[in-house]
């Protein structure tokens, strides 16, 4: 060690514990265009000031540790440290605050969601000084966004591949999710695609189990795709789940799907992990495969209002890591999803530029520059009576996916698909004619029933089905008043 280094490291050094806010709370800081910005919902332990809690989050997710260390003198903390630059109380909550933290871009490896999350949502979430901590939103700067490939293809390329425009895409998850043989599974795929669906889907927990090995499933599903395409004249697809126990096995399954000539594969991106997902997304772009993403495990992370991570952050991370579709809730079905919050992260998935809008839970303006968009998938407890609302809420650039709402039709799988396709076409036509789907939706469906006995039967079966439970993760009561 040189004398100069020894002198620099020893000047002003004193071992011991000091308050985080002395170094990491900087309300005078002006954020840079290259900073990654984070909004944390912080619940300090009793007796911990919010400034100290916010500073602790900034410190423990960047350069800080619990004590002063002499090696601080060997680097430029002012250049590399995270900074808590603003704190505001959460309306209606006595002990919760939103802490805004800015991170210098040099803290993160280029093109790595894994590294970004290891810092920002790492050990700090177990910090004893905090009763709870939730990451509400991230601002990803263009300088960092440009280091990612993002979705393999994006919305427009997918529409061109499928030759389908001017309406939402229509899908179905094959049920029962577990237990079918590969041949019976392929039969269900064929019947649904022949009936008018664009896609069918492996359920997220269908991988390669004793009752149905992955290779057999891929072969029977490919046969179903080609047979239904020949009979309908439409391009069809089935989300073949390539998720596996190792990255090598996952890629092997994707390679086999490509060799079969199918258009799309699938991945469970949270249980599979971001490193695996990014690897698969790169393979899909290089080999012309679309990539459908399921979000299994998300509610473990995002459902509680005061701890974890909001799904809008997971959605942004997926757009960076890569996926052409991702499940995004339904608002009207059986799964959790506040309407305004859902619309907020749907825009973050699809649009190139999204303005800050606290009424929809968007804390920062997000510029995606040239990163392709992702189609949101509405799936979970939906049926034909929901079609007007889904068409109105999600618009054309979406996938509406009915599992039980197709396979539960009293006449069988193909009639279930017919019912959904007729309902969708009726809603799109009515919307294009200027009718209000939110007001006239039920009437539009009833009119279509006159021309489709399959739809009439579906409407009769599901006329009483409701999922009327309150949303747990709601927006804060006065969020709409925040600029």
Curated annotation (Swiss-Prot):
Q: Which PROSITE patterns match?
A: RUBISCO_LARGE
* Sequence positions bearing Phosphoserine: 208
The answer to keyword Disulfide bond applying to this record is yes
**Modification N6-carboxylysine, positions:** 201
Name the propeptide positions: 1-2
Q: Which family does it belong to?
A: Belongs to the RuBisCO large chain family. Type I subfamily.
Quaternary structure, from the entry? Heterohexadecamer of 8 large chains and 8 small chains; disulfide-linked. The disulfide link is formed within the large subunit homodimers.
Could you tell me which HAMAP family the record lists for this protein?
RuBisCO_L_type1
Q: What does this protein do?
A: RuBisCO catalyzes two reactions: the carboxylation of D-ribulose 1,5-bisphosphate, the primary event in carbon dioxide fixation, as well as the oxidative fragmentation of the pentose substrate in the photorespiration process. Both reactions occur simultaneously and in competition at the same active site.
Its protein name is Ribulose bisphosphate carboxylase large chain
Which lineage ranks, top first, belong to the organism behind this chain?
Answer: Eukaryota, Viridiplantae, Streptophyta, Embryophyta, Tracheophyta
Which gene is annotated as encoding this protein in its UniProt record?
rbcL
